[in-house]
């Protein structure tokens, strides 16, 4: 049923687009050209010149005494474009069915073969607890680049479990992950002279085998779960988990490479920790509770 709705939406969008074209610009197609036209379920879309910034603040408040909280604010987010691949390599949104199980909503990233689609991100962060406000500084991501992969969401297979079940596949490069505890400064520069203190992790590469996206969670064979739980003692918390893998091939393998880790400080001096590499990673099970 959902697939039929998506088809109807796509047809409606196509008809609306045709309605804006003058009749004089339409040309008949030969049989050979028509034979090459094929349809697909789902919706394809892309971005062009995307950028946003402003005083938006996201806050997670704990139910514990005093309601301590963690916040992110003053967001900046932008994306560069691969102009030649805007329509040939889009994001894809699809809904598909599984035998005897709930339907899945799947969002697939562009393949980004040329590596031109890159994200820039910055946000301030802090913690409020015990009547004290701590401003942690600014988190900066430079040249965040996705190559394929994507996110799938559905309902948990166990009807007694509430929340969102998900699958996640990633092949991602990050030019620089930077934490500046004193001031944001110029977020487009990795190491400006005016910044006296920062942590910089550069050249982060995460992928699966053969440089393909790493299936950290699979919506059917190794689903992740994100939900809110209240235990028998009345304590509430956010829960993030990934189940055991049910595939006969076991959990997929990934790899992580970091080109350099550097601490910069005008007080204690600079410390260069060099590079790091984990050749093979298998995520068998994950259970994280946020209090």
Q: Where would I find each of the regions flagged by the language model?
A:
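Low-complexity repetitive segments in secreted/extracellular proteins
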Residues: 1-44
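Intrinsically disordered, low-complexity polar regions and short flexible loop motifs
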Residues: 44-291
């Amino acid at each position: 049923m959902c697939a039929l709705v998506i088809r109807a939406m796509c047809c409606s969008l196509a008809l609306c687009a045709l309605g804006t074209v003058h009749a004089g610009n339409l040309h008949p197609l030969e049989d050979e050209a028509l034979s090459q036209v094929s349809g697909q379920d789902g919706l394809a879309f892309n971005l062009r010149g995307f950028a946003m910034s402003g005083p938006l603040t996201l806050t997670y408040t704990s139910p514990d005494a005093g309601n301590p909280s963690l916040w992110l604010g003053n967001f900046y987010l932008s994306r560069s474009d691969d102009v030649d691949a805007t329509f040939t390599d889009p994001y894809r949104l699809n809904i598909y069915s599984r035998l005897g199980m709930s339907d899945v909503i799947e969002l697939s990233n562009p393949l980004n073969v040329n590596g031109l689609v890159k994200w820039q991100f910055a946000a301030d962060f802090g913690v409020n607890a015990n009547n004290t406000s701590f401003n942690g500084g600014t988190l900066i991501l430079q040249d965040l680049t996705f190559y394929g992969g994507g996110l799938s969401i559905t309902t948990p297979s166990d009807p007694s479990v509430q929340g969102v079940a998900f699958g996640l596949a990633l092949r991602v490069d990050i030019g620089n992950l930077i934490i500046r505890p004193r001031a944001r400064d110029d977020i487009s520069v990795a190491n400006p002279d005016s910044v006296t203190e920062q942590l910089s992790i550069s050249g982060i590469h995460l992928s699966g085998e053969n440089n393909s996206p790493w299936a950290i969670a699979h919506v059917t064979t190794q689903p992740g779960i994100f939900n809110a739980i209240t235990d028998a003692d009345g304590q509430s918390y956010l829960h993030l988990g990934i189940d055991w893998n049910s595939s006969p091939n076991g959990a997929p393998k990934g790899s992580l490479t970091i080109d350099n880790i550097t601490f910069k400080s005008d007080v204690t001096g600079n410390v260069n920790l060099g590079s790091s590499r984990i050749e093979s990673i298998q995520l068998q099970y994950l259970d994280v509770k946020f209090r």
